[in-house]
């Protein structure tokens, strides 16, 4: 009970995994390595005067690595959007993807430049043909021990 079985005949697409990381590498054999998995970002407390000048505290470049399985062969639409505290971010258009017969899983790595405006949960929501499959998240918090990030 409670265990998921990838061969249980469940219908429809599902999110196998999704996470933020700093880098990726793939071998010739197709093995994927995720480097610097990000689940927490510590930032120094901003100065009170600078908060009103620029709402962006830091900008981070992270990879979103995710894998979808269980889709029927044919044309589909993949939609990934960032949800962050603060001013809403521009939403990218959906991406058309072709799912071929016999494919069990497809994985994607998308690079995002994320403007951090406030502490809290930063998420990437993943939708496939308009169906929410899940999300990857990381938490931003203020810490006295944090070193300032260089905005890029």
How would you label these PLM feature ranges?
Residues 2-128, 132-152:
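Contiguous segments within soluble domain cores/interaction surfaces
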């Amino acid at each position: 009970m409670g265990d998921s079985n990838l061969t249980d005949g469940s219908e429809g697409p599902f999110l196998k995994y999704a996470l933020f990381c700093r880098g990726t590498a793939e071998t010739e054999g197709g093995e994927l390595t995720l480097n610097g998995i990000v689940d927490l970002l510590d930032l120094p407390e901003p100065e009170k005067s600078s908060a009103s000048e620029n709402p962006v505290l830091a900008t981070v470049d992270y990879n979103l690595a995710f894998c979808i399985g269980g889709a029927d062969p044919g044309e589909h639409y993949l939609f990934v959007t960032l949800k962050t505290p603060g001013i809403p971010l521009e939403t990218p258009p959906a991406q058309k993807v072709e799912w071929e017969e016999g494919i069990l899983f497809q994985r994607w790595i998308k690079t995002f430049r994320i403007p951090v405006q406030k502490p809290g949960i930063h998420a990437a929501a993943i939708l496939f043909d308009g169906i929410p499959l899940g999300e990857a998240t990381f938490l931003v918090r203020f810490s006295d021990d944090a070193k300032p990030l260089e905005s890029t």
